[in-house]
Design a protein with these regions (language model features):
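Active-site anion-handling motifs in enzyme catalytic cores
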Residues: 1-161
């Protein structure tokens, strides 16, 4: 089923803008966060930046992102996250980043849900912007929790060795 995904960039994002997905009032009342960091930033400053980002994610009402490194912490913190799938151009460059991850996220898209389900070969957690109650965003799927528990156990066992 993943061989069809190289076409998703044109299917999901046919020259769209953020305003196509998110109401203007939500954008105006939001904080935009960039993750670009100077390559010369020292370790202590990086740790401080990471802590500040995690605090922002934890206290957010909703996070809308196209970045996995933002979405995954939001899932673990219980912060509602809507993942905008973009940048997927071909199997070799991008699919390895998405395999097994998108099953556990809510995807914000303009695409018809059934078409996306067909492209992915399974039911995905997809939302059209018109379906979202922006004051009460959808809760994250809980399917990732069983994997989180397995990882916690493995990490604890490793640390205790």
């Amino acid at each position: 089923p993943f061989k069809k995904l190289f076409k998703l960039m044109d299917v999901i994002f046919p020259k769209s803008k953020i305003e196509d997905f998110i109401p203007k009032d939500v954008i105006l009342n939001s904080e935009k966060i960039e993750h670009y960091i100077n390559g010369e930033t020292d370790h202590n400053a990086l740790m401080s930046l990471a802590k500040n980002l995690l605090n922002k994610y934890a206290s957010a009402k909703l996070v809308i992102t196209s970045r996995i490194h933002c979405a995954i912490p939001c899932l673990s913190l219980g912060t509602p996250v809507l993942f905008i799938l973009k940048g997927l151009r071909d199997e070799n460059q991008h699919m390895s980043r998405f395999r097994g991850i998108l099953d556990h996220m809510n995807i914000l898209t303009l695409q018809n849900k059934q078409e996306l389900n067909t492209l992915f070969g399974k039911k995905m957690n997809c939302y059209h912007p018109d379906e979202i109650d922006w004051e009460n965003p959808p809760k994250n799927p809980s399917t990732f929790k069983k994997y989180a528990e397995i990882l916690k156990k493995k990490c604890t066992m490793y640390i205790n060795q």
